[in-house]
């Protein structure tokens, strides 16, 4: 560790939970922000706030050693641990900004017809494939996306990985997939031209235009098009390695087109990223000179590495958070920061037909949960603030989610997030940092009494156990 490493190192601690390399690298490497988006993209970029210190040129982060990547072919993986690495090495049609909205990547602009059933993507003309050493190996055109799409929806080639989005949304993609299933081993000989002849709703009018025809109007297709199902693949590389070879290509064999390359990789130990010298976005985006990911056995080790200045950030265990937050003079009290929310929602799902251990129906619970007033007591009276604090001790109520999905999953054509539309329809208030939205200005005493009266009348006894 040299002096420059020490001086330029910003210090911050993350609250709790696991953070993926994809979000960290992409945010600074260009995969999550871009210019050149069209009106239909609704894109907006947010520059990083300065803390007054020298910017980091090298970034040292971590990952759990049980989340090591297992695939180098992004088309043949559905594992987030793989995507955390691979989406920094390979770009697709679109990416997303820090708010989850699609922004330009290899497609520099896009639009759709009036009913959003046909989407046209206009590709950059300066995107190249390169090998692991940064040597240019080919030029990317619309053909590479045809090859990639055919690979994904060909059951023999990609073994059904990443098929759900194209099969659900693209015209005749499901029929073509079923066709490859029927062909069996013979599907290995199919090419993208066979896919086009079959009538699958994807075409390339020229080298830098790609058109998708959806089964039905699909106003959110730009959010779909950024997924790995629609990433490009090189026909030359597939022919060079063969189907099995490409499917299970190694780090040294694969070709790349993203903002970073892997400089060094030691399985379940470390991996380091360096800028891809051939990346099309090099002049428009800032990138770290190096990113090193250390694989950790546990958070205790990670905290020690942070204290030794060997990591720039680390997630904390609940006990460590408590220790720091309970001591305003703690050396790390001013280094705590909140984690960016992930696009997952956690929910209560009631069992309306519960059985006892002996196999008999749990009538007491089943009657209670069938009562609307009983369920509303849960909805309007359950304050989970202390539970949220186990994840976010700084602002626990930032964890509250009163919707079926999380923010950033989808939005309307005006750029308004789906959860905001639901919030308005339900009459929910906004986050205030003090009280849960569901329990705000609500006195459930009358509701509780109503539930108890109604349940007592049908023989329910209290307390109700589940």
Predicted regions and their residues:
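Bacterial lipoprotein signal-peptidase II cleavage site
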Residues: 29-40
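Extracytoplasmic/periplasmic ligand-capture domains
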Residues: 7-8, 28, 98, 124-158, ...
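Acidic glycine-/aspartate-rich tracts in secreted/extracellular proteins
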Residues: 67, 126-127, 217-218
